[in-house]
């Protein structure tokens, strides 16, 4: 999902308790379909609109750092040749492609995104990677049975989701015991003085990026759908509340981005 600037507005994350048709609905593990909520439909529509300029928008809004952040996420996943990985909120497939390179032709990468437009672009971009499959799907109802993957990743998608706690539980559910869940997400930087400078700078840059890519209206619509980002401690607590253990945090870009890794208990 697209990198969007943090905001201090809105409620914090609360820990939880223990090429297809564009009209396709998210699948369950049994192949059945489930209808989208109005919120899901709005998010999918907004991402469909920015899909043609998604990668350029990410580069501008991250000031060119998004590639190195994805590489850090791949390293943190701990995967190797022959492993199976699920990438949720996969967008146009930049992270999925990097994961596919790591697992090789005998591995598997399942890339899931709510936006048919993103899925179409991701599938086209990775068409030469036999180990990579793109599907339209809901992060809160992943199209997989339990314990099917060696790792799960989500990059810049969590804050867009209506049910973030449910999505984190799903990521944990589909990963085998001992496997890792990797979350790469914008977080409010600390110290607060840097957070205020960063927030003001990126909020000024974001409308310019939308204009430069020819999708200002679509970007503004998407940004209006996005709720607050957590600080790093809230993100860590969200992962722990899902049942993950050994949760580790690494701050990137002076804390404006957090890379969190948790392990599914044996």
Label every model-predicted segment.
Residues 63-81, 98:
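Conserved alpha-helix/loop element of class I SAM-dependent methyltransferases that forms part
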Residues 84-141:
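Class I SAM-dependent methyltransferase SAM/SAH-binding core
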Residues 150-164:
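A short SAM/SAH-binding and catalytic strip from SAM-dependent methyltransferases
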């Amino acid at each position: 999902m697209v990198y969007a600037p943090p905001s201090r507005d809105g409620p914090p994350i609360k820990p939880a308790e223990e090429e297809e048709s564009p009209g396709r609905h998210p699948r369950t593990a049994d192949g059945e379909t489930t209808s989208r909520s109005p919120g899901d439909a709005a998010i999918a529509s907004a991402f469909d609109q920015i899909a043609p300029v998604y990668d350029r928008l990410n580069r501008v809004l991250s000031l060119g750092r998004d590639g190195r952040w994805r590489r850090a996420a791949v390293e943190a996943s701990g995967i190797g040749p022959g492993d199976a990985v699920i990438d949720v909120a996969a967008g146009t497939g930049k992270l999925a492609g990097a994961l596919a390179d790591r697992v090789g032709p005998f591995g598997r990468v399942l890339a899931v995104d709510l936006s048919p437009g993103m899925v179409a672009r991701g599938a086209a971009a990775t068409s030469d990677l036999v180990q990579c499959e793109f599907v339209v799907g809901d992060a809160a109802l992943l199209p997989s049975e339990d314990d099917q993957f060696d790792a799960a990743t989500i990059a810049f998608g969590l804050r867009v989701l209506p049910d973030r706690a449910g999505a984190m539980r799903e990521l944990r559910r589909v990963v085998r015991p001992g496997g890792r869940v990797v979350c790469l997400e914008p977080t409010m930087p600390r110290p607060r003085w840097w957070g205020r400078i960063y927030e003001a700078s990126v909020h000024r840059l974001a409308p310019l990026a939308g204009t430069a890519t020819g999708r200002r209206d679509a970007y503004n619509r998407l940004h209006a759908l996005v709720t607050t980002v957590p600080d790093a401690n809230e993100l860590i607590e969200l992962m722990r509340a899902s049942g993950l253990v050994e949760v580790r945090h690494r701050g990137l870009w002076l804390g404006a981005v957090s890379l969190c890794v948790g392990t599914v208990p044996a």
